[in-house]
Amino acid sequence: MNLSDSKKKLALAGVVCGIVAACLAALGNPANMAFCIACFIRDTAGAMGMHQAEVVQYARPEVIGLVLGAFIISIATKEYRSTAGSSPMIRFILGVIIMIGALVFLGCPLRMVIRMSAGDLNAWVAFVGFILGVATGVFALKKGFSLGRAHVTNKVNGAVLPAIVVAILILATCTTLLKASQAGPGSMHAPIIASLIGGLVFGAFAQ
């Protein structure tokens, strides 16, 4: 694949995902959120009782679809393999910092772009911070910083997260064990089927 074809496919993926996000917002997702990885993980964590903020508790099918979409397409294209990174504690801490930073600015980079397209000035402030963060990371890499190489692990390991999200989907649709907000952003959501399909599309393109 040459660079031109790659850019065209990325542009097509961006257009499709943008349309999916707009459709999810029109079908009930928060208008200034549509599809946000950080926010949806927060909502799903709340649904499982991992935090007590009652306005952001809902098992988001988009997150489930995202994981399953990537998993299914990787198997279909024979690209599936399970890898594990080195320096797990550092990776964990960096992940926590990224999530806190995303939620402070009310969303992940995906939602940031969606909000920028709607003219939200706060998103533009976040964009400046995002650029500075990327520049800092590039500088660190050029200075030799590395977390070490990822290594291939047993394929069963890669199926653990898809199995977990399937279990969450079953609990969300077949039981009342998970929490669901009655007000606030957590109460605003598209129909489950539409959300799940949207997540599958995002996951497939991400893979």
Which positions does each model-derived feature cover?
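Membrane-interfacial helix-loop segments of redox and metal-homeostasis proteins
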Residues: 1-207
